[in-house]
Amino acid sequence: MNKYIFDCIDAHTCGNPVRLILSKKPDLAGSSMSQKRSDFIKNFDWIRKSLMFEPRGHDIMSGGMIFPPNDPNNDFSILFLETSGCLPMCGHGTIGIVTIALEENLIKPKVDGILNIEVPAGNIIVKYEKKGSKVLWVEIVNVDSYLAAKNLFV
C-alpha cells in the first residue's frame, strides 16, 4: 500500500470549510485549467476523495490547489475540489483560497489589490484589500454566463 502525506492549510469562509492543498500536487496534462481539470478527474480523483471525504474531510468540505498560470499575464490558477466533485468554479473556494494564499504569502500579486486567476470555467478577477498580514475582504468578478445547450428534452 502506498502512503502519501499531503500538507494542507484549513480555513473557513463564514463557517464553511476550505482546504488549500500545498503538497503532492499532480503534474496535470493540458494547456487550460479545463483540460487540467479533466486530467485530474480521470487520473487523480483519489486525491479529492482522500482529502475531502471522511475521515479527513466531511460532507461540505471544499478546497483546491494552486498552480502556476497557463497565461503569464495571470497571477495563478486554481483547481477546485469538494465532496461533490472537481468543480469548474467555486465562489466560496475562491474567497477561502485567495485569503489563505495572500495571508500565508503563497502568491505574489502582479498588482496589489487585484488578482487575475485562471479556473476551469475561464478567467476570473479577484479584488481584495489587505491590511498588514490580514485580508479584510475579497470580491469576485466571475466568468460570464453562457448558454451551454438549448432545446434539450428530458
Would you name each region that the model predicts?
Residues 1-152:
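A glycine-rich beta-to-alpha transition motif near the start of alpha/beta enzyme domains, typified by
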